[in-house]
Amino acid sequence: MRVGVFVSGMIVALPLVGASAAEAVKPLIRAHSHNDYMHDRPLLDALDCGFCSVEADIHLVDGKLLVAHDADQCKPENTLERLYLDPLRERAKANGGRIYANGPVVTLLIDLKTGAEDTYAALDKVLERYADIFTEFRGDQVTERAVTALISGNRPVRTMANQDVRYAALDGRPPD
């Protein structure tokens, strides 16, 4: 049996005999799913095509981290945990601690759309609950895990720089 996958203008036939779908996908380290949450199957479409970087824009709304590009598109059921973190954890458990079996670290670009400090404080607490899959930054030590979170958008630069332990890196800019 073969599955056709549309990737950047070409169709690739992937054999599925004797392998799970996740094992049959070749990780594409140069592929990024921008505004990934706009897909019918956020995260899953990107992973099924082998993407190693996905973007989720988040808004802090009533204490929840909701995924949407604009505030008026926020839906209470579209939490960061449900759309991204839980499925990533499931994949990592199924693939021996990686999103793709024996594959590279996957980047989750998290674009903070609401206030930097409040949104990051909420995100930091959530990421800590998923410490088993997220790369850990402790002083000068980096412990790579299945996923590296990369904070963009409204970035709490000083707050993150002053943390002893965190589970996210910072999207750098020229003034940094």
What are these regions (language model features)?
Residues 4-15:
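Bacterial N-terminal signal peptides
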Residues 22-28, 34-37, 42-55, 59-176:
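Catalytic cores of phosphodiester-bond hydrolases, prominently lipid phosphodiesterases
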